[in-house]
Structure formats: C-alpha cells, structure tokens
C-alpha cells in the first residue's frame, strides 16, 4: 500500500545545542559565533536521520543558509544529495519588516526538500515577524503546510487566523506541521482547531521540547478529519537541538507525479 512520509525538524540553526542547561548556558556563544565543524557535525546527524527514515518530504525550521556567524556554511546544501533534487529555502521574515534587513537575522530560514518535484508556494502571514509558511501540494487534493509561529501569544492568535484564511482558500485535505511555540499549553489552539476542523496527531503526553528539567509539547502535526485514521506520528529525539523531530506517515496516500 502506498504511503507518504514527512519529516519536520527544528534544527536550531545547527548550533549543536541540546536542551540541557549546560549546553544552553555554557555554549550560548554559538548563537553569535559557531564553528563550521560544529555545524558539520549537526548536518551529519541530520543526514543520518534522513538516511534512516527515507522521508518523501523534509521540512526544516531554524536552518541557516550561510552568514558571518557560520562562515557562510549553507546547512541545507550540506544536507541535500541526489535523492532530494527538489528544494527551496527562504528567509522566514517578510520583506516588509525591518527584521528582514538585520544582517544577524537575514539568514534565518525555513526550507524543504523532496524526492519529487511538488508544486509549492511561499505564503507570508499578515501578522508577526516570522511569517513564512510553505504550502506544498502533495497531490491534487492534499496540501502540506509548515511554518514557525511567533513566541508571543497575542501574535500567534493573529497568525492562527491568518493561516485559517489560507486553509479555507485551499481545497481538499490539509496537513499542518510546525513549531507552534505554545509553551502555555494547547488550549490556545482550541479556536483554530474548532474553525478549521483540524485534528492534532500528537500524543499529548509526549513532549517535543526540553530545556533543563522543563518539557513542553510545541512541535505539532495536524490533519483534516478525512485522513486522520491514515496518519501516524513518531517523535524522534535530536541530541543537537532542543526540539525533537516529527515523522508523519500518511498511509494509502500517493504523491503527485
């Protein structure tokens, strides 16, 4: 039976910082300057995950496409190989915001790669600073969206409304994956889920983020009711990031040719 496998990973800009207190405090300087060797080690670990899982589509948030802090090392291009010839990478900040012009932030990106050429769009939400949403057509009636929402709850609420409008304008079934930054709890998603009718695939007891002793469920996969029974999600720890990766299997689904 055909299936589609999607990997969604927040690699934390390849700084090699786990959620441990020691990493986040003693190695915090990596946010300003990070040796290429460290980033290459992270990229190699990501490649091992990709090789093991063999996803059809990989989505990355918090990926660095090369800047002074990283000695112009392009993490996505180091991850890619001949199995994933189709890709895109873009700054997550809308060009109309001042953040897009700040050199330190200019290389902060979202990206994806795929085994097949899939129609896609870069959609920018109307609210917030981080606005980029990738809209990828997996098949004529199935669309994948992935993004990275604001850390501010009030801005997230506006972004959820913005994304809802995009979903409403897109026919067929939907899959939404991303870093939702809902550190205050999943109840803030209730209006969005009610209006879109999306269902969360995550096990609520399995956190995806850690800092020291704190744990939180912030990285989510959602899908339309019509495909929920065919969706299975696994959480994969990443020692090089404070976020776990999501592996979503959609059974009885075929990618567009």
Q: Which stretches of residues belong to each language-model region?
A:
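N-terminal, active-site-proximal structural segment of metallo-dependent hydrolase catalytic domains
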Residues: 1-82, 253-257
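Active-site beta-strand/loop signature of hydrolases that rely on acidic residues for catalysis
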Residues: 6-10, 42-71, 144-147, 162-190, ...
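Active-site environment of divalent metal-dependent phosphoester hydrolases
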Residues: 14-15, 65-68, 95-97, 152-155, ...
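Short aromatic-enriched loop/helix-cap "lid" or pocket-rim segments at secondary-structure transitions
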Residues: 16-22, 71-73, 99-102, 157-159, ...
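Short, flexible loop segments at the rims of nucleotide/cofactor-binding pockets, characterized by
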Residues: 33-39, 123-124, 150-155
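Structured beta-strand-rich core segments of catalytic domains in phosphoester-bond hydrolases
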Residues: 38, 62-141, 234-238
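Metal-dependent phosphoester-hydrolase catalytic domains
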Residues: 118-124, 137-139, 165-175, 180-257
């Amino acid at each position: 039976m055909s299936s589609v496998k999607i990997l969604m990973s927040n690699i934390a800009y390849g700084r090699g910082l786990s959620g441990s207190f020691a990493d986040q405090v003693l190695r915090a300087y990596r946010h300003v300057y990070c040796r290429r060797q460290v980033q290459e080690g992270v990229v190699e670990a990501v490649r091992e995950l990709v090789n093991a899982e063999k996803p059809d589509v990989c989505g990355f948030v918090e990926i660095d496409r090369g800047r002074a802090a990283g000695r112009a090392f392009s993490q996505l291009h180091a991850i890619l190989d001949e199995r994933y010839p189709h890709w895109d990478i873009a700054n997550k900040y809308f060009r109309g915001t001042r953040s897009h012009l700040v050199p330190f932030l200019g290389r902060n990106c979202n990206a994806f790669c795929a085994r097949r050429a899939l129609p896609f769009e870069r959609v920018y939400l109307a609210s917030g600073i981080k606005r980029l949403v990738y809209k990828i057509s997996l098949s004529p009636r199935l669309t994948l969206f992935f993004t990275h929402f604001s850390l501010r709850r009030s801005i997230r609420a506006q972004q959820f409304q913005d994304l809802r409008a995009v979903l409403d304008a897109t026919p067929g079934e939907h899959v939404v994956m991303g870093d939702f930054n809902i550190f205050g709890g999943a109840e803030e998603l209730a209006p969005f889920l009610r209006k879109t009718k999306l269902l969360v695939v995550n096990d609520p007891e399995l956190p995806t983020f850690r800092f020291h002793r704190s744990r939180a469920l912030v990285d989510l996969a959602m899908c339309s009711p019509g495909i929920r029974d065919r969706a299975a999600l696994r959480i994969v720890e990443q020692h090089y990031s404070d976020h776990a990766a999501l592996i979503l299997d959609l059974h009885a689904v075929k990618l567009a040719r």
